[in-house]
Design a protein with these regions (language model features):
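Metal-dependent amide/peptide-bond hydrolase catalytic core
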Residues: 1-9, 16, 57, 180-185, ...
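Structural motif
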Residues: 76-79, 108, 143, 173-175, ...
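Active-site metal-coordination/substrate-binding segment of hydrolases
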Residues: 77-146, 168, 375-378
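Acyl-CoA/ACP chain-elongation machinery
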Residues: 102, 149, 209
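Acidic/histidine-rich catalytic neighborhood of metal-dependent amide-processing enzymes
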Residues: 117-193, 391-392
Length: 392
């Protein structure tokens, strides 16, 4: 493994890998792949991976492009997961350079998706290609799962690719999701889990009437307010050493006709639980519905479970990731389960270790999104070193 460390340091200093990875990342950024559009982005990756000896399987579901690129055979199966779709750039005039014209300035690569996550995807792809070149007869399988549906509904992307893999008996052993996990410096944080997400869509029924005759109406705002106050005050759980306590947040409330003298006939609210492994979605649903009935709220309520919580608290993948970050970057990464959901929720299952390891997240989804070109190279060597630890 010392040979890898020497090779990485020499390459970073010479700028060879930095130049190559930046070039691939720039090609990807140049594709305006705002969900659900691909704009030719995945074809760039497929072509390079095919040339490196990977077998490519296109997995298009409805209007979403996805692909599975694999090299090797059997277990263990190490997967690098990423997405080519990006969020809209927002006002173009606010950008210092066009969002889909990759621009390098002062060591930073600018463009929509630079950090989330085309830059990192380039690092993963090039590291994987280098690994199979150096170790053509490696153990097991190394694969890339690339989706075009992460930033939007996430209904026709990773979740369906994983379903297809499971149907044919391909079980993922380890998965590195390339989301931008770093907070202050590259490699300072590894996400070893994520909270679950459960959203409720509530419709409170009232009776519309004149504000001067409240006895002839039923105000859904008043009806719901006491229940809401209690919902906001509940301690749902205490969390644990890996997760903070489960949180309840209301994101939208809408009621009223716009007139100042009309009691509304209905109220709509949207709320969300970000829940730890100490709570279950069924128990949260039941608790909310029982509380609403206790407060005599007349309601309809539908639920959407976006993902269960997952946690990789130990294992070979986490050991390899921490060791490679320490070796290549020279820091000890911290473990965290903070933040929103990721596609890791679709991949996590019993027996599968899942982590997120990627670049700084300071500029993601922002105007002038950027990534350090040196960090692109460092990530390349971290991923390469991890592959050599696990599969060489």
């Amino acid at each position: 493994m010392e040979r890898t460390a020497k090779r990485s340091v020499n390459a970073v200093l010479a700028g060879e890998i930095e130049t190559k990875v930046t070039a691939l990342a720039s090609d990807l950024i140049g594709c305006a792949s705002v969900t659900p559009l691909d704009a030719g982005c995945q074809a760039i990756l497929r072509e390079q991976l095919t040339s490196a000896g990977f077998s490519i399987e296109d997995m298009r579901f409805e209007e979403i492009d996805n692909f599975w690129a694999a090299h090797g055979k059997g277990a263990p199966l190490l997967v690098f997961a990423g997405h080519t779709d990006v969020v809209p750039p927002g006002p173009l005039e606010s950008w210092s350079s066009p969002p889909f014209t990759p621009t390098v300035k002062d060591g930073l690569l600018y463009g929509r998706g630079a950090a989330d996550m085309k830059g990192n995807l380039a690092s993963m792809a090039m590291a994987s290609m280098e690994f199979v070149k150096l170790h053509p007869d490696h153990k097991g399988t190394v694969a890339l799962l690339v989706t075009g549906d992460e930033e939007a509904a996430a209904e026709n992307g990773t979740v369906k690719v994983v379903e297809k893999l499971r149907e044919r008996g391909e079980k993922i052993t380890w998965c590195v999701v390339g989301e931008p996990s770093s907070a202050n410096v590259l490699g300072d944080t590894i996400k070893n889990g994520r909270r679950g997400s459960l959203t409720g869509y509530l419709n409170v029924h009232g009776v519309q009437g004149h504000v001067a005759y409240p006895e002839r109406a039923l105000n859904p705002i008043h009806n719901f307010s006491s229940a809401l106050s209690e919902l906001c005050s509940i301690e749902w759980d205490k969390g644990n050493e890996f997760f903070p306590p489960t949180s309840f947040q209301v994101s939208n409330i809408r009621s009223g006709t716009g007139a100042e003298n009309v009691i509304p006939g209905s109220l709509e609210a949207v709320f969300n639980f970000r829940f730890s492994t100490e709570s279950r979605p069924d128990s949260l649903r039941m608790a909310v519905e029982e509380l609403l009935r206790k407060h005599n709220v007349q309601f309809d309520l539908t639920w959407r479970l976006s993902g269960q919580p997952f946690l990789t608290y130990a294992g070979k993948l986490l050991e390899a990731a921490r060791g490679s970050v320490k070796k290549i970057i020279g820091i000890e990464p911290q473990l965290s389960t903070s933040g929103g959901t990721s596609d890791g929720r679709f991949i996590a299952q019993p027996g599968t270790e899942v982590i997120e390891l990627g670049p700084l997240n300071a500029t993601i989804h922002k105007v002038d999104e950027s990534i350090s070109t040196q960090d692109l190279a460092s990530l390349y060597f971290v991923y390469l070193d991890m592959m050599e630890s696990l599969l060489a």
